[in-house]
């Protein structure tokens, strides 16, 4: 695939899936402004590095990985994990939603990524493995452990 064709594929994916990338960034950083910055920086990097895209078929997974990497870079710069008190919760949110948000916030960053990708972004285990550069079995076992941690925190 030629460089111009790759750039076009990346640009089209960014346009078609912008909301999805924003939701992913927002679910990781829980700030509208920061999520917008992350998506903008991710889009720029995706276009500039489009020659490293190997196959058109994986463009969405590739861009999701860039968004996650940018969110991780954001946290490294801030040295601060998102706090439930900073979340924009509507009055319709129930105590269960708040408890779930707190439980998810208490997970390690990689664990939180897996849970968000699986249950909030509806990614398949295989897609998560590609995005996180892990084996499918590793993702499955981490997801299982995360669900156990969440269950204990929500029941206790």
Task: Describe the role of every protein-language-model region.
Residues 73, 80-105, 124:
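Internal acidic/polar
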Residues 33, 126, 137:
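Residues within helix-turn-helix
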Residues 132-156:
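DNA-recognition helix of helix-turn-helix
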Residues 114-118:
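A short pre-motif secondary-structure segment
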Residues 51-54, 65-84:
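Arg/Lys-rich amphipathic alpha helix in sigma70-family domain 2
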């Amino acid at each position: 695939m030629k460089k111009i064709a790759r750039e076009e594929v990346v640009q089209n994916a960014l346009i078609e899936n912008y909301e999805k990338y924003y939701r992913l960034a927002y679910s990781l950083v829980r700030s509208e402004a920061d999520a917008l910055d992350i998506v903008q920086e991710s889009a720029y990097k995706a276009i500039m590095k489009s020659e490293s895209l190997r196959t058109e078929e994986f463009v969405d997974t590739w861009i999701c990985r860039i968004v996650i990497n940018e969110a991780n870079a954001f946290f490294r710069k801030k040295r601060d994990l998102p706090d439930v008190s900073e979340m924009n919760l509507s009055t319709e949110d129930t105590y269960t939603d708040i408890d779930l948000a707190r439980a998810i916030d208490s997970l390690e960053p990689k664990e939180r990524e897996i849970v968000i990708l699986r249950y909030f972004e509806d990614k398949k285990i295989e897609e998560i493995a590609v995005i996180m550069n892990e084996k499918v079995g590793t993702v499955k076992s981490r997801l299982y452990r995360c669900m156990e941690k969440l269950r204990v925190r929500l029941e206790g």
